[in-house]
């Protein structure tokens, strides 16, 4: 009887211990309200805010973590803007940029004064577990949002975890806590389609370590570091694509590369034609969502898009079909970037045999003015020699090292199979 009583007591003690560890949102807020700040980008001339976000104490107590996109304006114009924090009690101070992880949208800032003690960091809790995000939504003061760990965000790498709650603008860069009040990630509220996600804290730990060896003292240092990181990430990503085994999909008489990566989704994009149309057109569009914030002008880069078009007609004569085919095969990268941001496209054209069929290929590149070595690439290849059927492929990559894209384009062509 006594052993049974002891066992019951031990079980109850364990349950009470777990209950005591788990905190509610009110307690988590109270424990961390002095650790979470508003991060501001201020104009040096006017002293007024240009953009705001959130940040929190990490490392030795003189460092603040936030999102890269929160402070992105200083990348292009550090002479015009500077960084500042604002505490809940109204105290403020200037900050210096220490280190960046552009691909994961992280930035580490430094203060000359001791700001406080950092909260403990921990790994992500199991999927479905409650998590709590703190930040300064819409410049309305410090707030906390309750959600759950929704797992890895589809079409991204493992650096983006879905947050089921709502993160309003201004909460980006704030901490995400588990039920024990430990930091398990950083809020990101910029995702399109109103999706919020968090970046796991392990990437922040790496950034704190990196800050001891990084120097970002000039405008040139900033640009060079951003360029290096983006190109390194994209080159690795493209290399992984090339090494993968690609499944195929079928479009009329062709077998084509299908979903070449877990980061990619493919959709039917065929235009709805009138019943009186004299031709048929089929289109498949595949793209990734693994995008990277670059700066306040260029916004998001790292896009991969590939599209397939098939055109056929039994009604048009050869000349009519050729004119229609040419009109449709005029793809370009959708962009509002001006010449002060990117150069004009420089293109080369050649003919290549693909699966016993001749195709006319165009390879175009344009350079980023502010980021040396960074390019957008546009590749097209169109089937030739047929009077009533046509096919063309378009591949678009943004903010990449040009040479790294060539093996990928070559693999696309090698993977096309003609089925007469």
Residue locations for each model-derived region?
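Flexible, gly/ser-rich surface segments that form the specificity/activation loops bordering the active-site cleft
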Residues: 23-24, 73-75, 117-160, 168, ...
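A conserved glycine-rich beta-strand in the N-terminal activation segment of trypsin-fold
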Residues: 23-25, 42-61, 93
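C-terminal cap/linker of serine protease catalytic domains
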Residues: 24-29, 95, 183-254
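Catalytic-histidine neighborhood of serine endopeptidases
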Residues: 52, 59-102, 127
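Catalytic nucleophile loop of clan PA
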Residues: 56-57, 166-186
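N-terminal targeting sequences that direct proteins away from the cytosol to non-cytosolic compartments
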Residues: 215-286, 397-420
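Short, well-structured beta-strand
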Residues: 228, 347-420
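Secretory pathway targeting signatures of secreted, lumenal, and periplasmic proteins
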Residues: 264-324
């Amino acid at each position: 009887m006594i052993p049974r009583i002891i066992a019951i007591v031990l079980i109850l003690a364990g349950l009470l211990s777990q209950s005591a560890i788990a905190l509610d949102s009110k307690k988590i807020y109270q424990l961390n309200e002095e650790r979470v700040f508003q991060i501001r980008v201020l104009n040096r001339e006017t002293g007024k805010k240009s953009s705001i976000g959130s940040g929190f104490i990490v490392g030795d107590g003189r460092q603040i973590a936030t999102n890269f996109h929160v402070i992105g304006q200083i990348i292009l114009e550090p002479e015009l803007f500077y960084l500042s924090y604002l505490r809940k009690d109204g105290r403020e101070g200037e900050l210096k940029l220490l280190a960046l992880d552009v691909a994961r949208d992280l930035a580490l800032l430094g203060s000359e004064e001791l700001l406080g003690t950092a909260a403990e960091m921990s790994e992500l809790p199991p999927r479905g577990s409650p998590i709590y995000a703190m930040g300064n939504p819409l410049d309305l003061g410090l707030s906390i949002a309750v959600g759950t760990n929704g797992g890895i965000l589809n079409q991204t790498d493992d650096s983006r975890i879905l947050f089921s709650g709502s993160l309003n603008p201004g909460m980006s860069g704030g901490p995400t806590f588990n039920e024990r009040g430990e930091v398990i990630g950083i809020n990101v509220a910029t995702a399109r389609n109103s999706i919020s996600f968090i970046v796991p804290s392990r990437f922040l730990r790496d950034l704190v370590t990196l800050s001891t060896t990084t120097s970002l003292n000039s405008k040139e240092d900033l640009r060079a570091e951003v360029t290096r990181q983006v190109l390194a990430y994209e080159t690795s990503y493209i290399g992984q694509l090339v090494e993968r085994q690609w499944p195929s999909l079928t479009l009329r008489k062709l077998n084509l590369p299908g979903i070449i990566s877990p980061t990619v989704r493919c959709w039917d994009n065929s235009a709805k034609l009138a019943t009186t149309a004299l031709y048929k057109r089929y289109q498949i569009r595949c793209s990734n969502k693994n995008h990277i914030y670059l700066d306040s002008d260029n916004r998001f880069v790292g896009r991969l898009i590939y599209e397939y078009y098939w055109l056929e007609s039994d009604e048009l004569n050869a000349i009519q079909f050729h004119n229609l085919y040419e009109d449709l095969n005029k793809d370009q990268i959708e962009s509002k970037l001006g010449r002060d941001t990117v150069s004009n496209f420089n293109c080369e054209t050649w003919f290549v045999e693909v699966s016993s069929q001749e195709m006319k290929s165009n390879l175009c590149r344009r350079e980023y003015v502010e980021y040396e070595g960074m390019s957008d690439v546009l590749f097209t290849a169109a089937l030739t020699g047929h009077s009533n059927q046509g096919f063309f492929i378009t591949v678009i990559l943004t903010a990449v090292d040009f040479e790294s894209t060539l093996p990928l384009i070559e693999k696309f062509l090698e993977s096309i199979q003609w089925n007469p």
